[in-house]
Amino acid sequence: MTIEIARAADVAGGEEILAPDDWYVPAAPEALTDRRVEITGPANPAKMAIDALNSGARGWLADLEDASSPTWENIVWSIRNLRDAARGTLADTSPEGRAYAHRGDIRRPIVVTRPRGWHLPEKHVLVDGVRASGSLVDFGLHVLHTARQLLANGHGPYHYLPKLESHLEARLWNDVFTFTEDHLGLPAGSIRATVLIETIPAAFEMDEILHELRDHASGLNAGGWDHLFSLIKVFRDAGPEFVVPDRASVSMSAPFMRAYAELLVKTCHRRGAAAMGGMAAFVPDRADPEVTAAAIEKVRADEQREAHDGFDGSWVAHPDLVEEAERLREEVPPDRFTTHFEPAARLIAEICLADALVDFLTLPAYELLE
């Protein structure tokens, strides 16, 4: 019943483009082969960007979306800071006169920039009198000012793509990437993208999204909180069987969230892509050891669960959590799902997982809220 309701809500449809099993995304560039722990944070102010660069994380999600207020000044400064970071010249001075810069004795993280989503306009850039998409403004400015330097550094113009709802949006991004490489003289396939699967329509099209990105695909990310919001939004009028408990009571251990995570990992590893876990959104307090201990314990639980689920890496929100997350990743190697088994068995397993994506009835008892 649930899968039929999902199809009626237009979240499980899509083109039948994936009959062959023998396709894979290209091998990850060397800079993206180890993504065990990535730190997230804005690219402006410069001090926060420098903190991310000095965190010791494998990667830095330089966030122009959720972690950044989309004012024009903020966007421009973010791009400037990313340019200077690529050049190795990013520096800042506090009002008290303290200087900050990237430390040469610490591993420099690979920068993976997240532009705004397609739905957010940029009023300061008009195309034929119409506001441009903030996603294209952010991507275009970033690639124009950093791509060649990043490639010279042995990295590349790598991006996270947020809020996709369809493989058609991935197709559009692929066209944008190809156009950009052609017009800027960048090597084909040097622009790489990891797609956030944070809407229920995208959860039904993970294979299609990777297929559309083709040579520009790097992986998928499980954006659990946004995915849960998408479920609530899409099925808000679908009837009592689609009522979920208070959001704070629904964790990644809920059956429909487990199905989402498992299907993402299976899809990525079958296609040779990286499966990135979600945010460990707990922040330590250097002035309060008890708060810090609680945050580390929650991060430990998240990291262990994701490693056992087969995720290749995950995010943390604070530099003080990087070392603990790295240590846990070394302790618990990922249990990768097999990429080779009988097509019929795989199809049955994935139909069951797809059905479970919208099965809100199989939930433990929760306290009812007034």
Predicted regions and their residues:
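Conserved alpha/beta-domain cores
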Residues: 5-25, 29-30, 39-44, 48-53, ...
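Active-site-surrounding "flap" and adjacent substrate/cofactor-binding loops of secreted or lumenal enzymes
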Residues: 72, 76-89
